[in-house]
Curated annotation (Swiss-Prot):
Record GO terms (molecular function): DNA binding
Annotated InterPro entries: Host_transcript_inhib_Alc
Keywords for the protein's UniProt record, in alphabetical order: Bacterial host gene expression shutoff by virus, Bacterial host transcription shutoff by virus, DNA-binding, Host gene expression shutoff by virus, Host-virus interaction
Functional description taken from the UniProt entry: Participates in the host transcription shutoff by causing premature termination of transcription from host DNA. Acts as a site-specific termination factor that abolishes transcript elongation on cytosine-containing DNA but not on the 5-hydroxymethyl cytosine present in the viral DNA. Therefore inhibits as well transcription from other phages that contain cytosine in their DNA.
UniProt-listed Pfam families: ALC
Protein name: Protein alc
Source species, domain of life: Viruses
């Protein structure tokens, strides 16, 4: 943001309560000079704008890549789990696997290649499943008794975890 567009009122609103025309005060304490605070405010606005633009670019990129990544994951799962009696399908937007009364859903992240896997196994508790998963994976708590959510998995890791927890 251009320094000339930043008004004294904007600086006072961002940093303090009152001004004497030179400094900004919060209560009885001087926060800083208006000129210095204008520079700081301009940097903050520019930083926020840059971050927002980057985030929007990444989000748009992910949206564009998601359909292909989901289809690729579905084909990969079908190939890897072909010898097991399972159903691989896309439920709304993400791939799912139903195998041996387990329901597995994958949340695909096309940008990083690290995906999330949720498994609902009516025959095992979440704590039992967590014990069988390697310690290097991040496991999120779930309020459901027979559900586990594992973060940061590659495609190969997903297949191995499904085999471990659902076979």
């Amino acid at each position: 943001m251009d320094l000339q567009l930043i008004t004294t009122e904007m600086v006072v609103e961002a940093y303090g309560d009152t001004t004497d025309g030179i400094s900004v005060f919060k209560g009885n304490r001087r926060v800083g000079y208006i000129t210095g605070l204008k520079k700081d405010l301009a940097k903050q606005v520019k930083r926020k704008t840059t971050i927002k633009e980057y985030r929007n670019r990444r989000l748009e990129q992910a949206r564009d890549m998601l359909p292909d990544a989901v289809e690729e994951m579905k084909v990969f799962l079908e190939n890897q789990l072909a010898k097991y009696d399972c159903e691989v399908f896309i439920n709304q937007t993400q791939p799912n696997v139903h195998i041996n009364s387990c329901k597995c859903y994958i949340i695909v992240n096309p940008l990083t290649g690290k995906h999330r896997l949720g498994i609902s196994n009516p025959n095992r508790s979440a704590s039992d499943m967590a014990e069988d998963v390697e310690a290097c994976f991040k496991i999120s708590k779930s309020p459901a008794e027979h559900h586990i959510l594992i973060n940061g998995l590659s495609q190969d890791d997903i297949v191995e975890v499904i085999k471990t927890l659902c076979m």
